Structure formats: structure tokens, C-alpha cells
Curated annotation (Swiss-Prot):
MF term (GO), any: protein-(glutamine-N5) methyltransferase activity
Residues engaged in binding S-adenosyl-L-methionine: 125-129, 148, 190
Gene assigned in the entry: prmC
Protein family (similarity comment): Belongs to the protein N5-glutamine methyltransferase family. PrmC subfamily.
EC number from the UniProt entry: 2.1.1.297
Pfam family, one: MTS
An example Gene Ontology biological process: methylation
Record's keyword annotation contains Signal: no
Keyword Isomerase: no
Protein name: Release factor glutamine methyltransferase
Protein purpose: Methylates the class 1 translation termination release factors RF1/PrfA and RF2/PrfB on the glutamine residue of the universally conserved GGQ motif.
Catalytic activity annotation: L-glutaminyl-[peptide chain release factor] + S-adenosyl-L-methionine = N(5)-methyl-L-glutaminyl-[peptide chain release factor] + S-adenosyl-L-homocysteine + H(+)
Keywords, alphabetical: Methyltransferase, S-adenosyl-L-methionine, Transferase
Length: 284
């Protein structure tokens, strides 16, 4: 007598994967399982539920296994699925770029609120292009420029700008170096700001997969503010704004840098968790 082959229905794969990913330390294992299996099977999440009792064929099972194995090694879901939503737009993401965070939407909101008529905008450290593209979409008459040192990130930012029909001019280089005598009404930046010693304690998704050059802000995390804040006035038109994203506990020190550099109307803005996430100021 031959044994009956085991039948893996969608329900059974979902249940097994949810437990497996939770065991591997994945938060939100239930939701992530649904996204992974949806991607592997080419279904939306409702499609999974209405096909609960459908047995999977060997190819479908192999596709599920491949994606689940990657997530079990703590590769970020966004790199596996290839996209992340930001400001209502879908961005292609690869390991060349930091995955856009929802907290970063605060700098976009502040920029649009305080500088709605900016005609020339600069984003330093453009990464996936999320801030630059979101601003270009909301300020269609503005010239938006992005600077980035990573060639892989520049290529992806270009792809994301084209995907959304956003006019963003990209320069490869460090900070203000590629800009010559251009001047801006608004400069935004989400620079690397994690203190070097804290990198090892980050979640494996961040520590092992996201680009270190997007995270490491030097010994106290403030290296990039020390470079950007004093240099910015030379690249701002009169009345122009500088706004930077920052990490927990950095606002007071960065505000001090703004005041000492001569910025006025300085402000801090909080993320949805009440953490000071953005500092900004205007040049007189
Ligand atoms: C924290 S990530 C932000 C990416 C994107 N703007 C976002 O908000 O998701 C910082 C970015 O700055 C880039 N970067 C690091 N050093 C740089 C430098 N000296 N000049 C320009 N870009 C730099 C990194 O490659 C990375 O893409």
C-alpha cells in the first residue's frame, strides 16, 4: 500500500507559515504571511480567503517556500515584495536603499505646510527618492533636485521618479558638492543619524539588510547635521527653509546648531508617536 501524499491547502500553508515566522521572531507574522503568500500565488488577500481550501500544486508550494525562507532569515518584507508605500505613492525598493518609513512623511508635511510656494527644492541623501518624488508631485511647478552618494540609490530614485511622472533632477555626489552655485527655497534631508555603536543593537532586518551608509551617523549620530546645517545658508535663497529629519533625543542639539548658524523661526515637529522627528528653520 502506498501512503497518500500530504495535501497542502492555502489554509494549511497560511497556518503553518504564520507559526514558523512568529517562531523566527517576525512581528505581525499573521499579516506578513498573508502578504508573502499573496505575492507567491499572484492573489490578493481576499483571493487567499476565498480559495482557503484549494490544494497547492508543487510549483505554487515552491514559490511560497522561497519567499517564506527569505523572510525567516529576517530579510525585510519590503525587499522581498519590492515595494513600499510612502505619502500615498508606491516606491520600488531594493537593498540599495533605505526602506521609506512613515515617520519620514512628517518632513514632507512640514515642507508643504511651511514652504508651499518653494520654486527650487533640494533633497540631500535622496535614497529611494521618496521625499523628493512626494514633494515634486505636490509642487508640480518646483524644480526638485536630489543629491545622493550611492550609484545604486540614484538609479532607483530615477526609476521611482519616472514611475510617478515626477520631475526630479538627480546628482551623484556628497552633500552640496555637486551643486555649484545653485540656490534653493527649501532644503530637506533625512540623513543617516544612528550612532555607530547603536547599529549592532538594531533589528536584524535593519542591521543585516539595509545599507549601512543610510544609517551610520557617526559616533553620536550627529555627523551629518554638523556638515549640513552650517553649510546650508550658502545654498538657500533669502527666506529659504532648511528642514532635517532626526532620531530620538537629537532635537535639542540640532536646534542649537540651527540657532547658532543664524536660522530664524526654528521649529520641531513630532511624528505620530509624539517623538520630535523634524527640526527646521528659515534663513533671514
Ligand atoms: C536615511 S537615508 C534617507 C533616504 C531617503 N531620503 C528616505 O528618507 O528614505 C540617507 C541617505 O543618504 C545617503 N548619503 C549618505 N551619505 C551621503 C553623502 N555624504 N552625500 C549624499 N548622500 C549621502 C545614503 O546613501 C542614504 O541614501
Amino acid at each position: 500500500m502506498t501512503e497518500k501524499p500530504e495535501i497542502w491547502t492555502i489554509r494549511k500553508v497560511l497556518d503553518w507559515t504564520r507559526g514558523y515566522l512568529a517562531e523566527k521572531g517576525v512581528e505581525n507574522a499573521r499579516l506578513e504571511t498573508e502578504w508573502l503568500l499573496s505575492a507567491a500565488l499572484g492573489l490578493d488577500r481576499v483571493g487567499l480567503y476565498v480559495n482557503f481550501d484549494k490544494p497547492l500544486n508543487p510549483e505554487e508550494l515552491a514559490a511560497c517556500r522561497g519567499l517564506v525562507a527569505r523572510r525567516a532569515k529576517r530579510e525585510p518584507l519590503q525587499y522581498i515584495l519590492g515595494t513600499q508605500e510612502f505619502c500615498g505613492l508606491d516606491f520600488v525598493v531594493t537593498p540599495s536603499v533605505l526602506i521609506p518609513r512613515h515617520d519620514t512623511e512628517v518632513i514632507v508635511e512640514e515642507a508643504l505646510r511651511r514652504a508651499p510656494h518653494a520654486a527650487a527644492v533640494l533633497d540631500i541623501g535622496v535614497g529611494s527618492g521618496c521625499i523628493a518624488v512626494a514633494l515634486a508631485k505636490q509642487l508640480p511647478h518646483a524644480q526638485v533636485v536630489g543629491v545622493e552618494q550611492s550609484p545604486g540609490a540614484i538609479a532607483l530614485a530615477q526609476r521611482n521618479a519616472e514611475r510617478h511622472g515626477a520631475r526630479v533632477t538627480l546628482f551623484e555626489g556628497s552633500l552640496f558638492e555637486p551643486l555649484g552655485d545653485q540656490r534653493f527655497d527649501l532644503i530637506v534631508s533625512n540623513p543617516p543619524y544612528i550612532p555607530t555603536a547603536d547599529l549592532e543593537a538594531l533589528q536584524p532586518e535593519v542591521r543585516e539588510y539595509e545599507p549601512r551608509a543610510a544609517l551610520d551617523g557617526g559616533s553620536d549620530g550627529l555627523d551629518f547635521y554638523r556638515l549640513i546645517v552650517p553649510a546650508a545658508p550658502e545654498y538657500l535663497n533669502p527666506g529659504g527653509w532648511l528642514m532635517v529629519e532626526l532620531g530620538i533625543g537629537q532635537a535639542e542639539t540640532v536646534l542649537g546648531m540651527f540657532s547658532r548658524t543664524g536660522f530664524c523661526d526654528c521649529f520641531t515637529a513630532q511624528d505620530p508617536n509624539g517623538i520630535d522627528r523634524v527640526v527646521g528653520g528659515r534663513i533671514g
